[in-house]
Amino acid sequence: MKHNRMRRLLAGVTAAALLAAPALAAEDTAPAPQMPDAWAVGELADSYAMGLVDDNYTTYIQSTITSEQLSAMTGIVADKLALLELPQRAADTEGLVVDTTRGGVMNALYQEAAAYDIDGVEEGAAAFLTGLGVVRGDQAGGLNEDRPCTYQEAMVMAERLILALYDANDAGSRGLLWKAVNGDNTLYLLGTIHMDRSNVYPLHKSVRDALDASQVVSFELDLNDQEGMALLAQLQAYSDGTTLADHISPELYARVQAAAVSLGMEPNGFDAYKPWALASTFGVLSLQDDTTGTNAMAIDMYINAYAVNAGKTIDSVETYAFQGGIFDGLSAEYQEAYLDASLAGY
């Protein structure tokens, strides 16, 4: 896992894989990507952040959910609800049929909520889930419980159930959110860090409401600027025919090689990269542990996906050229010291 993250970081890939229309390079014989319906696009960011979908969602999101996928999904719901520490109850779920129909998926999700003392849970799966707005039915109001359930439908039900119960219990990560008002203008400032923990999501309703109320969302860097990220990737690597070993001491180079091996790479796997690029990457990796989100969706990336899928204007306060230029302009001595310090954990 660390090996894959290292590759992504060194390549300068900081944008989320969670936008509604990802760019896919595929063979002519590959099946067409399965795109989410318009009504589900707004649910993608939270679904991905909570692990309900992964980077490969365009290969299965419109397919009928499998029993294995449903089991994994209900496991995520169970883990999220357990964090609420709600009073438990003896759940009367005997006779509920759990299968891959819409009704079966509703029953599976209801079973997780029925273990807790929640208002309305005693009314049964359909009444409880519709009452929360988890299941909204078709235009005629039908729940279509006998129809096969797509992964997309199950994902949205699970995401809505988690958010509804977290919101009802005033739960979720609040972070550090400031609000400034001047006349008709409102500015929200949210403190973020470029990584997360697996229990960060969902964010508190106050944070999501601030996002919903915003017309423009500004970041340190535009995570959708592919040209900028490509430029940063170029700045990170040597283009003059030299390698890392030509720019740092033999002792420090040996430590870099040892770190590469510990990450499952070849000893010379970092030869193409400059000291500052490696130092930044090792610094991020040193902060990761077993609680780091496995989907690597840092708060910045979550908010970007949320905002883009909602059609909001994206802005940034810096450019990749500006930020990359600062790092690339560091003296050779400073870069070597920076890399040396970042290797303390290896």
Regions found by a protein language model. Name each.
Residues M1-E27:
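Gram-positive cell-envelope targeting signals
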Residues N56-Y60, A168, P267-Y273:
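Surface-exposed patches in mature extracellular/periplasmic domains of secreted proteins
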Residues A49-L52, G75-A82, Y110-D117, T130-V134, ...:
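Sec-exported extracytoplasmic/periplasmic mature domains
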Residues D55, D170-A171, S198-Y201:
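Short gly/ser/thr-rich secondary-structure transition/capping motifs
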Residues D28-P36, Y166-K179:
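N-terminal low-complexity, Pro/Thr/Ser-rich intrinsically disordered segments
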Residues L176-L177, V181-Y346:
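Structured, acidic catalytic/metal-binding patches in enzyme active sites
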Residues A26-A78, Q88-E123, V134-L161:
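Extracytoplasmic Gram-positive cell-surface binding/anchoring modules and repeats
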